[in-house]
């Protein structure tokens, strides 16, 4: 385990996990003195067989916020899911992001913040099937995602990349309008001339301008879905979604796939920390 990761496993079961996870990271010491990225994954998430939690956090103004999210966000999400298992997980993710945003702003000193890209993968019964059905063939895998900022999640489906997140940047027209309506200014594609992202966890000195409310999605995972890429902008600054997927589509090991993407980012001029998580589905 690196100093900047939280890799957690629930008790092993006699059943196989249907997904495989690989992670690679690099401080990029040519341009960065510190590593502010954090990643987390949890097998058998919420003590449920074959559920998964996957997340990357890209810190700024210090590592405090990203480290706090790496240690605590999955616990908040788990508690909220188990408190009411009938709730839409997208609502759970939204509430959990807002809760940890408040925690960071009240419990941590300074103005540290982070972007976040989070996935919850779980088995569900379709609405048309009784909740007490024991027929495993009737269960389906559902993926729920949430993000703030410009960390991104991409699904590779049937040869095509599908972006499951939204880049909350000050250069985005909708986000620019929201910030200005809240009383902020966009200068040189930055909030008040300082911060490039318009949504994050933490950043308490920006108050209502930079918010923790995430973009959320849900999608059924089928046999057409090959893998997920979760990565900070250190990767996406130098490669687009489809090219990233094409680069690793023939690789059979997720750790190797993640390493290939990190290596590509470093060789193609990224100036940021780089963290990549690849989940084979």
From Swiss-Prot:
Its EC number is 3.1.3.16. It catalyses: O-phospho-L-seryl-[protein] + H2O = L-seryl-[protein] + phosphate; O-phospho-L-threonyl-[protein] + H2O = L-threonyl-[protein] + phosphate. Residues 20-281 form the PPM-type phosphatase domain. Keywords: Hydrolase, Magnesium, Manganese, Metal-binding, Peroxisome, Protein phosphatase, Stress response. Mn(2+) 1 binds at residues 58-59. It comes from the Eukaryota. GO terms for biological process: fungal-type cell wall organization or biogenesis; mitochondrion inheritance; negative regulation of MAPK cascade; pheromone-dependent signal transduction involved in conjugation with cellular fusion; signal transduction; tRNA splicing, via endonucleolytic cleavage and ligation. Pfam families: PP2C (PF00481). SUPFAM superfamilies: PP2C-like. Gene3D superfamilies: PPM-type phosphatase domain. Its cofactor is Mg(2+); Mn(2+). PROSITE patterns: PPM_1, PPM_2. Binds 2 magnesium or manganese ions per subunit. Manganese is about 20 times more efficient than magnesium. Also has activity with calcium. GO terms for molecular function: MAP kinase serine/threonine phosphatase activity; metal ion binding; protein serine/threonine phosphatase activity. It is found in: Peroxisome. Mn(2+) 2 binds at residues 58, 233, 272. InterPro entries: PP2C, PP2C_BS, PPM-type-like_dom_sf, PPM-type_phosphatase-like_dom. Serine and threonine phosphatase. Involved in tRNA splicing and cell separation. Present with 1520 molecules/cell in log phase SD medium. Belongs to the PP2C family. Interacts with NBP2 and PBS2. This is Protein phosphatase 2C homolog 1. The lineage of its organism: Eukaryota, Fungi, Dikarya, Ascomycota, Saccharomycotina.
